[in-house]
């Protein structure tokens, strides 16, 4: 059936900011879909609130709206643009929920807009737990015994009948938000209450736990002619009970018999047909390991995280084809873009094994509960490809960016058998490492299987790795053993430690013995047809399939998995750099290992290597390709950290030289450079021992800002107010020694300014200056950023521009640089300089129209700024006001403190733009998920240091009609200022107290600042967590509170009696 000609304009709904459960995979799928629809000649309009994505580039669609994904704003765009149809199935859960809201509000009917891809009825049947269960019963497909509940009493009724454990699955939520497994009444009350709150339709499914079954996923496609295929099936190494986004997954499935595979395949195809889905769909199934009994867990009637993984695992571009199917094309009409010979109706075949391991944020949030369950906690993931499962798993382990090179963690060696048993039964992020450790200590596979029901096949593979470790240690220098270890995926790093050599010595030993990997192609058809895609993975085998051309090439290092501090912004910069390399006439080669991103789409670069970003894996590619050089500026800290080792191997680092990178990152060298340039910075020194740190802090004077050198996202950064806190930090947060010094700075409470610039060594061009709403001390990634600056005098702006130009030239920067300044007592100080792409590059590129990563790449390749039409100086400011607001995923991470500080906590960002700061702020805050009601109650509990400042804020809330609630201490201060306030009980009171008010939704905002010294923070911590669990905006910075007040004041009219007005006027005259 040819494509539809009765529709011309299609509105694509994006997925909004990156949160846990919805990451960069939707930038990849959304970008693919928009391009796919444009190829077919449709006019594409995109709405998305996330400025950090390729998807929101103006070239991706015919019209791009970066606006909040709320009913109010999307309806407005629909009424203005009058599209013929909307495509919501590529915007994750956000897109689906938006489609349902739009349909229910009547705006689609009013404007005659059709939903493409998955019909509304199918979305509701798949997402509404009750309708889905009914459909499964009609199809005779087994689901676990379950009950739909809308309150706690109904939950009790089900549990009394069926017994514990039970699984709670809220309807219409993302990444299992609010759900979990309940083993007793206490957990039932907590999880059901949370689930009902998070479900937009106040509905949960309670089902008998089938934890322990194998969890299998099928990624299926169907078109309007009822052709349906399986693109990929995947198996979770973790049995049912751990969210699939938190599971280690392999593709294709490894432990199914042909009968089991076909049985589950038929079920998946029967379900997609019954739902009438046109496009992609993900079916999750549970299989009893001891019989042919299976259960349908759930269906995602959209492109999902698993479809991004399946696309990268097979090379079959699901989102691209789903978009074509949505407009009427059928699988037998669409050519497979990989082979360019076969059609899309051929099911992909794999002759390799793919492993995906999630990347969790527990290195950032040490206090978080690390236990894994049905609510997702990972921020991102890595994928690797190998010829056997051992190789594939070990490659994935070293891709995680945790400084791990093998399935082994030193701190687990101390664990006794009982502790290991507990942690294997109750899964956490280190379970696979603990399984390996247990096998090393002699625990049998049978015992481990009894503890966690992980399949014997997977346990055998881990045992194979452990046995090989013993072989390696027993045969130092043996080349045959080395060959076998390399075929199994062992790293040079591991072997070097076992043989008491350096990694370089092992590398040289292998090269001397011709023991190097070859590169195989990912071709969707197990080499049955010739493939046209340059998409490769390494393995130790015979034939190399990566053909080196005679064109000059440049390698770009990607940024690895999405994690807090290094998000999709770096992928954005990587992709733009690759495009610029191609424009400059070079062959662009990319190395990365993140299956969710646009950069690992094989159509982006000339060659894609899906490999770990370690020196060994990168050098294999460089040895083969012999590029002109490597660009490290766009891959965040991941790539920068490889620069020194690459140079040791004789590889040319393009752009800012290694020496100059080091000058910006090394404290003492940086200080010397600033002194030479005459640029002031806060007083600070470097400590390499605890005693030194104490002495420096005494000399500088508290409060001080402490942090390790060479970090991204403010890892382990803290503001310390007294000596015992400093000692606690030195003991717990960092391991200080000569190679890992700790930086100690005077903490200045001033306005923070951020600048991104491009330098070619001679000229320094500044596209934009951003002002942070929160004072210095809150990490720049967690601050609300405003462009152009709203409160900087021209004199200060000139100072900032002068300092930026001097730093660009003085540090010999070639490419991008990011500088953070603090304005303190009308003086500009430099806090830090990052000689690389920063997380504000996409935001500023979109606002100013300067394609920063593109321009910087061309500068790196030798085309100076003047040649490109830019000179030294500041780009003219835009008329509109733009706000970048952070988005957090606290609802997914229990027991993480929400207080903002120098360590970054946000997972994503949104943009708000309008003619005034207030309107732009309103859009930014609403897009980030903060509800802004114009009246209600605000709870104020602030630290003594903030009381004076909080008075002015409280007064302004009162003036716009808000009711103020406070505990005794704060209430007294308010009463003394004649501000009406209602006293509420502290949280340790047995009577109705502050937490009850939050739980019952009687407060719209909670203002809670941290007491100096962090110890009495436990009360504050409970208040902040309770706010998050109940969806109440909790403001831990008075600057953010002021920003919200500006918005509220602009939306509401203050009401003053005439007498008040005349008194104010008389007052003004007296002062005249």
UniProtKB/Swiss-Prot annotation:
Its cofactor is Mg(2+); Mn(2+). Residues 1-401 are annotated as: Carboxyphosphate synthetic domain. Pfam families: CPSase_L_D2, CPSase_L_D3, MGS. ATP 1 binds at residues 129, 169, 175-176, 208, 210, 215, 241-243, 284, 298. Mg(2+) 4 binds at residues 832, 834. Keywords: Amino-acid biosynthesis, Arginine biosynthesis, ATP-binding, Ligase, Magnesium, Manganese, Metal-binding, Nucleotide-binding, Pyrimidine biosynthesis, Repeat. Residues 402-546 are annotated as: Oligomerization domain. Signal peptide: none annotated. Mn(2+) 3 binds at residues 820, 832. Mg(2+) 3 binds at residues 820, 832. The large subunit is composed of 2 ATP-grasp domains that are involved in binding the 2 ATP molecules needed for carbamoyl phosphate synthesis. The N-terminal ATP-grasp domain (referred to as the carboxyphosphate synthetic component) catalyzes the ATP-dependent phosphorylation of hydrogencarbonate to carboxyphosphate and the subsequent nucleophilic attack by ammonia to form a carbamate intermediate. This is Carbamoyl phosphate synthase large chain. It comes from Bacillus thuringiensis (strain Al Hakam).
């Amino acid at each position: 059936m040819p494509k539809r000609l009765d529709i011309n304009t299609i509105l694509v709904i994006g997925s909004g900011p990156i949160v846990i459960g919805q990451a960069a995979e939707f930038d990849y799928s959304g970008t693919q879909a928009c391009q796919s629809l444009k190829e077919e000649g449709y006019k594409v309009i995109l709405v998305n609130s996330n400025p950090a994505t390729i998807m929101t580039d103006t070239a991706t669609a015919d019209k791009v709206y970066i606006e909040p994904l709320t009913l109010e704003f999307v309806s407005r765009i629909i009424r203005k643009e009058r599209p013929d149809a909307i495509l919501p199935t590529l915007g994750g859960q956000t897109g689906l929920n938006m489609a349902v809201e739009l349909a229910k509000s009547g705006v689609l009917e009013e404007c005659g807009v059709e939903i493409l891809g998955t019909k509304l009825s199918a979305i509701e049947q798949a997402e509404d737990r009750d309708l889905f269960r009914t459909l499964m019963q009609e199809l005779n497909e087994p689901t676990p015994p379950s009950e739909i509940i809308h309150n706690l009493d109904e939950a009790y009724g089900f549990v009394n009948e069926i017994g514990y454990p039970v699984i709670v699955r809220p309807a219409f939520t993302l990444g299992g938000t609010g759900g979990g497994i309940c083993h007793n009444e206490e957990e039932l009350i907590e999880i059901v209450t949370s689930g009902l709150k998070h479900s937009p339709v106040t509905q949960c499914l309670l089902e008998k736990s089938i934890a322990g079954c194998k969890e299998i996923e099928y990624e299926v496609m169907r078109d309007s002619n009822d052709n349906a295929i399986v693109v990929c099936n995947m198996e979770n190494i973790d049995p049912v009970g751990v969210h699939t986004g938190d599971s280690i997954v392999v593709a294709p499935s490894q432990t199914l018999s042909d009968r089991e595979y076909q049985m589950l395949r038929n079920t998946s195809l029967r379900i997609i047909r019954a739902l009438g889905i046109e496009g992609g769909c993900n079916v999750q199934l549970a299989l009893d390991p001891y019989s042919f009994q299976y259960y349908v867990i759930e269906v995602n009637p959209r492109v999902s995280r698993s479809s991004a993984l399946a696309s990268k695992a097979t090379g079959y571009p699901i989102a691209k084809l789903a978009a074509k199917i949505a407009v009427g094309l059928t699988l037998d009409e669409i050519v497979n873009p990989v082979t360019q010979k076969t059609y899309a109706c051929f099911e992909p075949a794999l002759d390799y094994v793919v492993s995906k391991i999630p990347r969790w944020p527990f290195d950032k949030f040490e206090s978080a509960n690390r236990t894994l369950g049905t609510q997702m906690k990972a921020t991102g993931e890595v994928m690797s490809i190998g010829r056997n499962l051992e190789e594939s798993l070990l490659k994935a382990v070293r891709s995680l960016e945790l400084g791990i090179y093998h399935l082994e963690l030193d701190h687990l060696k101390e664990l006794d058998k009982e502790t290991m048993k507990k942690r294997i039964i109750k899964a956490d992020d280190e379970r696979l490492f603990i399984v390996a450790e247990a096998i090393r200590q002699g625990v049998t596979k049978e015992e481990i299987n009894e503890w966690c029901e992980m399949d014997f096949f997977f346990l055998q593979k881990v045992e194979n790795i452990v046995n090989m470790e013993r072989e390696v240690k027993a045969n130092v220098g043996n080349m045959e053993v080395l060959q076998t270890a390399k075929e199994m995926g062992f790293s040079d790093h591991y072997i070097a430690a076992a043989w008491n050599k350096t990694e370089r010595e092992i590398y040289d030993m292998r090269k001397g013995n011709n023991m190097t990997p070859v590169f195989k192609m990912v071709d969707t058809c197990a080499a049955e047809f010739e493939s046209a895609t340059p998409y490769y993975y390494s393995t130790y085998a015979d034939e190399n399939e990566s053909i080196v051309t005679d064109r000059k090439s440049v390698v770009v290092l990607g940024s690895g998995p999405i994690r807090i501090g290094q998000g999709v912004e770096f992928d954005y910069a990587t992709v733009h750099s690759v495009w610029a390399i191609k424009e400059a006439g070079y062959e662009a080669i990319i190395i990365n290992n993140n299956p969710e991103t646009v950069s690992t789409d094989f159509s982006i670069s000339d060659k894609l290597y899906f490999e770990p970003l370690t020196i060994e894996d990168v050098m294999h590619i460089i040895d083969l390709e012999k590029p002109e050089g490597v660009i490290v500026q766009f891959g965040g800290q991941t790539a920068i950290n490889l620069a020194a080792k690459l140079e040791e191997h004789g590889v040319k680092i393009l752009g800012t030289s290694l020496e100059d990178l080091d000058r910006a990152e090394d404290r003492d060298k940086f200080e010397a450079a600033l002194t030479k340039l005459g640029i002031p910075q806060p007083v600070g020194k470097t400590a390499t021992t605890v005693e030194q740190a104490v002495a420096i802090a005494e000399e500088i004077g508290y409060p001080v800002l402490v942090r390790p050198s060479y970090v991204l996202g403010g890892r382990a950064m803290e503001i310390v107010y007294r000596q015992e806190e400093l000692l606690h930090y030195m003991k717990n947060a960092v391991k200080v020694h000569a190679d890992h010094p700790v930086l100690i700075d005077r903490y200045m409470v001033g306005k923070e300014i951020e600048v991104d610039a491009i330098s070619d060594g001679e000229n320094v061009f500044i596209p934009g200056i951003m002002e942070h709403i929160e004072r210095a001390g809150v990490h720049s990634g967690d601050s609300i950023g405003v462009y152009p600056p709203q409160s900087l005098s021209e004199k200060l702006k000139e100072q900032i521009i002068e300092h930026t130009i001097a730093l660009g030239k003085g540090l010999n920067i070639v490419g991008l640089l990011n500088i953070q300044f603090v304005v303190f007592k009308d003086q500009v100080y430099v806090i830090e300089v990052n000689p690389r792409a920063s997380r504000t590059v996409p935001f500023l590129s979109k606002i100013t129209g300067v394609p920063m990563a593109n321009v910087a790449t061309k500068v790196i390749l030798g085309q100076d700024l003047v040649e490109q039409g830019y000179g030294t100086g500041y780009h003219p400011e835009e008329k509109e006001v733009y706000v970048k607001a952070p988005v957090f995923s606290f609802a997914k991470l229990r027991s993480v403190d929400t207080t903002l500080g120098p360590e970054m906590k946000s997972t994503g960002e949104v943009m708000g733009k309008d003619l005034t700061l207030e309107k732009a702020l309103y859009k930014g805050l609403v897009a980030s998920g903060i509800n802004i009601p114009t009246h209600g109650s605000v709870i104020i509990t602030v630290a003594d240091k903030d009381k004076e400042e909080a008075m002015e804020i409280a007064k302004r809330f009162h003036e716009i009609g808000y009711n103020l609630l406070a505990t005794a201490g704060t209430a007294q201060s308010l009463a003394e200022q004649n501000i009406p306030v209602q006293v509420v009980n502290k949280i340790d009171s047995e009577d109705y107290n502050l937490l009850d008010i939050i739980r019952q939704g009687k407060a719209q905002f909670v203002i809670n600042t941290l007491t100096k010294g962090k110890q009495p923070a436990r009360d504050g911590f409970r208040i902040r967590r309770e706010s998050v669990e109940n969806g109440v905006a909790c403001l831990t910075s008075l600057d953010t509170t002021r920003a919200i007040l500006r918005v509220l004041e602009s939306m509401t009219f203050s009401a003053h009696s005439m007498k008040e007005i005349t008194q104010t006027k008389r007052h003004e005259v007296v002062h005249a």
